[in-house]
Amino acid sequence: MINYKSYKASCSKGTDSKPFLFVIFYITVVSNAYLFNVPCFHFIFKEEHTMLEDMKKNSNLTFTENGAVTNGTTGSDCLDLFSGIGAFRYKSDGEIIKSFIKAFTENPDMAMKILFFGRDVREGLGERKVFRTIISWLGNNEPKSIIKNIEYIAEYGRYDDLLSLLDTKCEKEVISFLKVQFDKDIDAMNSGKAVSLLGKWLPSVNASNKETVKTGKRIAKVFNLTDEKYRKSLSALRAKIKIIENNLREKDYTFDYKKQPSRALFKYRMAFMNNDNERYSEFLANVSKGKAKLNTNNIYPYELIEPYLSTSFLHNEQITFTEAEKETLNATWASFPDFCNDEDTLAVIDTSGSMYCCSKPTPASVALSLGLYFAEHNKGKFKNHFIEFSNKPQLIEIKGETFADRLRYISQFNEIANTNIEAVFNLILDTAVKGNYSQEDLPKKLILISDMEFDYCVENANETNFNNAKKAFEEKGYKLPNIIFWNVASRNSNQPVTKNEQGVALVSGVTPRLFSMVASGELSPYKFMIETISNKRYAKIVA
């Protein structure tokens, strides 16, 4: 305890006030660090190496599938969750829940914010399956954390996410929430006012899927409605919402394409081509001329690439498109928002064999789509270029006027090689040294889009690839560019760096929205996570 009166008296006698100011500063930093659970002293004091810390560091070292030294964890369970949640779709439910339990135990509030960031379809990663798996676990094991956030689940995702909480300890609260919203929508509809999207996502009692029918009947019963009354109510709500499925079922193609949601426009594009080609082509032509807008908010770049690249890349087949497909693909791709800035950044894409081993979407399609997107939208000197991993990395210049042309062009460079990250670093460093280029000539950032299963480092197999690269650049008088490790298939939860590494960010997922998030300032993994989930959008999410 500080005796302020005694200290003030000593100051009046000419005692130096600097120690007191330092104590006040120390207390301020400690209190803030405690509130936000942020490790803050690494920038004030030099970290002391103890036997315990060194044992932790050594026991954390592990190997990638290709024999490279890497880290088993970042040193923060929350950061492990944050850095991988966008790539968890290939994991089993048990593995997903295991990762979340660790993070939730470390910091419940932070884990919940990461969870909702992972689901957020508008400003986050848009991961549906992972979110539903975790909230189902929470519903049985931490029901209070679900009840506090029930009203936000549909806001960040969809109303049918709530159905994952049936048969959990939160079922009563979920049913009550759905019933209140259902009644509000019925009243609003009868008054000619706008309604929510609940009617679109509630299960039908006359669907073709037996499980959907079973759940629909269950909802109707707890809503105190007969199956017939429930069915008619949903039909009326869906007519009010004007969901396009009603039109397609009735073969009614009088709807306005400009007013359709992005997911529906993409999902039913073949039906439009086959049954309403003249009007649909006219709409696409107007999009190309800037006279109409094609919404792409809930579409991801890999969805345009997956049907064409997954097979052709594996079997060296040529990509072919019909003219109608070309029109649709070109208009959709050109309508994606631009999330890139004018920084000199270069993407590096992993198309090794392991990137084709998972179910759809294949990680290779995700990586290629993001690489192509970023190369096109890059405004720096590396515009329209990306690198593919290999023993001899390929720097590919993208050519072609339209998306279809460019997609067909990059498919000719398929090698399905290995993930030699050391060779990528050497390509950049050797070019800089031989050409006597300045630091300013190098890329400011490298975005490494991969499953993180890198090859072992030939130069020093006892070090991580990142540490080896950093040393190699320093020895030649250069600084390693900032690195964005972008995970698209987290099979083994390896971490290329730990939480406080400077000049690095750890991200994951399929959305190009992340490009805008990693565009600013100095990076470190933990700091980047804190900045992301401290966004006011997630302030209301608590455990």
Language-model segments: residues:
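Short, often N-terminal, low-complexity regions
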Residues: 9-10, 17-20, 34-36
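Long lumenal/extracellular ectodomains of secretory and single-pass membrane proteins
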Residues: 39-366, 376-543
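Low-complexity intrinsically disordered segments
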Residues: 12, 24-25
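Low-complexity, intrinsically disordered or signal/transmembrane-proximal segments
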Residues: 4-7, 26, 34, 42, ...
